[in-house]
């Protein structure tokens, strides 16, 4: 649910690509909004701001351009965004992320997240994550037929899981 918090004409856009339990999206709004809801059942959502013309709050915690936000299965979305806000997001199957974290990264997802919804992974890791999500969206917009191949979907899914663990 989106509720516009500032007066004026609303202009927004949502672009998404979905495959094999993965969603990559880009969302833009020109007005301050309050977003409420929940991610897909059994999923983990991660968002990274691209543009912010003010401050945001995610589940009560302050968010700036150097932060990323995350929401897991069973978590409630409570996100106040400023005017002129744009975000890139990744939603993955939480069980697949837990398995990837344990078997590939040798990390415990719950320990890595530590119940936090806002992270400051550092400029380099944040920039790499932004570039990867933008690149995946751009590549698949140009060549959507690539997703017809299950192997391509698996490679992209593994890349997305690795990228998610790199920023938390």
Regions inferred by a protein language model and the residue ranges of each:
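Short, electropositive, low-hydrophobicity segments enriched in small/polar residues
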Residues: 25, 51, 76-78
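N-terminal low-complexity or simple alpha-helical regulatory segments
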Residues: 1-49
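Alpha-helical bundle regulatory/interaction domains
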Residues: 1-9, 55-168
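Non-catalytic surface loops within mature trypsin-like serine protease
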Residues: 31, 50-52, 94-96
